[in-house]
Amino acid sequence: MVHFCGLLTLHREPVPLKSISVSVNIYEFVAGVSATLNYENEEKVPLEAFFVFPMDEDSAVYSFEALVDGKKIVAELQDKMKARTNYEKAISQGHQAFLLEGDSSSRDVFSCNVGNLQPGSKAAVTLKYVQELPLEADGALRFVLPAVLNPRYQFSGSSKDSCLNVKTPIVPVEDLPYTLSMVATIDSQHGIEKVQSNCPLSPTEYLGEDKTSAQVSLAAGHKFDRDVELLIYYNEVHTPSVVLEMGMPNMKPGHLMGDPSAMVSFYPNIPEDQPSNTCGEFIFLMDRSGSMQSPMSSQDTSQLRIQAAKETLILLLKSLPIGCYFNIYGFGSSYEACFPESVKYTQQTMEEALGRVKLMQADLGGTEILAPLQNIYRGPSIPGHPLQLFVFTDGEVTDTFSVIKEVRINRQKHRCFSFGIGEGTSTSLIKGIARASGGTSEFITGKDRMQSKALRTLKRSLQPVVEDVSLSWHLPPGLSAKMLSPEQTVIFRGQRLISYAQLTGRMPAAETTGEVCLKYTLQGKTFEDKVTFPLQPKPDVNLTIHRLAAKSLLQTKDMGLRETPASDKKDALNLSLESGVISSFTAFIAINKELNKPVQGPLAHRDVPRPILLGASAPLKIKCQSGFRKALHSDRPPSASQPRGELMCYKAKTFQMDDYSLCGLISHKDQHSPGFGENHLVQLIYHQNANGSWDLNEDLAKILGMSLEEIMAAQPAELVDSSGWATILAVIWLHSNGKDLKCEWELLERKAVAWMRAHAGSTMPSVVKAAITFLKSSVDPAIFAF
């Protein structure tokens, strides 16, 4: 049984939410955010307004308050059940009440209730949170203000308590009745090089000649068609550091919020010249739900998500090392593997997989990721070939905690590398499954290329395993560090490591220093990174480091209302209440008891609409029959007894769901493959053999723009094998024509060069020179590393 979230309402009442204003303060790689929701009741009856909105799952929400007609009401964090009861009680007694809570099934969805808003009254509701900023491959710090909340596909057994079960109205982005404004202030002692965004911004205003402080604003008219993303480039981001923050003065020592907290960041300098692994089991789990048929970017419809996915799989298949094992799964409402079980990577198995990939379509309906994951984990392990799982999805799943729990249970068997595709992807799902298994996560939005991010991650997965990772503290006598972050077991080249600790004991006199040492072993060699820091905690009224430390600890214990073990549930509740950071078990409630106007009958309920992006609704192929402003309801949900794999389709008053083939990777509905156009780079890569070589044939000649006869005539006499000549020409063509996308073909080019060295031998320098001359290329022969 499936349910589809979302309702296009026919009601014409004024929407009480008028605007959202956001203030962002970024210091180094931490962001503090204050978001204000401005409400006004233009009706003649008291209202209750309900608003569902997205948040990044790493956000530590620690404050909630309301300003009603000039009066400030500060909320209290309470046990969620108690807060809900108190909210209903306050409303029934004629008081005004405000409730903020996270969704029961996902960390990245929140809801806000404004109860008993009087006619003509205005209310400004402000929530505050802090979060770490992830580091991109090019050195940029990435801040995202989520603005898109896609409908989430719900599978049988999903939590009925989810706020996504509520059919909040959805409207086209151009009809959204409220606005968004944002001002961001950025500070870094290392200097700010530039700030970029996927949305129109005001020109960057530097607040000093040293460029250590800057401010940008979101241009007016944001359409909620994408998340607001800032890419911040500092002059230096790879400096290890320790930030020490003073605890709350009125809190007893020994408590998290009473003791000083430390935030430690390292950038391990792992040597790049280490040989890559040639073993492993690589499973690629690709989303084939209906939403994968939408474009990668709302601003650029040149490539659909499914098309980018197919190109990505081709690149991944060509880049795998000889001797490994692999498989491909497509999933939606059903799933099927390319092979019954993982197979050895050979020319034959690669070609068979490529044939399936070429025919792949976004035709599998919804987004049920749990079933294929369970099937993968049930499979036998291959001795000497550790499992590396690559998950590609637009993340439109409701019960993310169940999926994360499944990954966590099997974390000893594998590493999971996750990719969130498109706007509104669930950060809770994508980050959660990577964190649970020691992998990494990537988000692909705007003009990002799925191909580049996937191949960079494959390169990471092939790195030699870093072992014996440890973090040690050297502190004065009487002072010790209690680690709050999970033990670090995996390190990747180019990755930033962040850990939190609570310093317990007696803080020494001024001008005393401490030291933290990160130690790890790589292929038998021991490496150490050290950072020395002053033992002088600094006060912060927002307790930023303490809140982030609490959030880090909560992420290890809080798995939602249904999935959290009883032992962790109590710890998570107590930690949430002590730190003031919201969790699955707590909610913020504010009550204005000065308002004492008993409600005559039920309050008029107003659900604040949220935007819908065409193509974002998980299993739907949307046909607009009577405009977007009619209600979307199912006349009747599919029967719970409906056989698995049978078409799960029903009529709606506005949208009609088309037939979908729920077969495996090959669609029986559409056997022809969409061509790869004139993209010669993809065509060239497609024709590479599993061992890294190319064959000399008409396909290669067409890509090179020459006749086959010309190419054969130019082959040096000392090179007997025509494949060797073809391979050298292909590699030179890659460097000449695809250098901007080198990160996408770097691994497969390594295979080609290694194959050439083994086959050309001492003739390689002269053959390479002849090929460069023949192609009239300026490529440096050193790329072949004779």
UniProtKB/Swiss-Prot annotation:
CDD domains: vWA_interalpha_trypsin_inhibitor. Keywords: Tumor suppressor. It comes from the Eukaryota. The keyword Ion transport does not apply. Residues 1-131 form the VIT domain. InterPro entries: VIT, VWF_A, vWFA_dom_sf. One of its GO terms (cellular component) is nucleoplasm. Residues 281-462 form the VWFA domain. Expressed at low level in many tissues. Not expressed in 80% of tumor cell lines tested. May play a role in tumorigenesis as a tumor suppressor. Altered expression of this protein and disruption of the molecular pathway it is involved in, may contribute directly to or modify tumorigenesis. This is von Willebrand factor A domain-containing protein 5A. The gene is VWA5A.
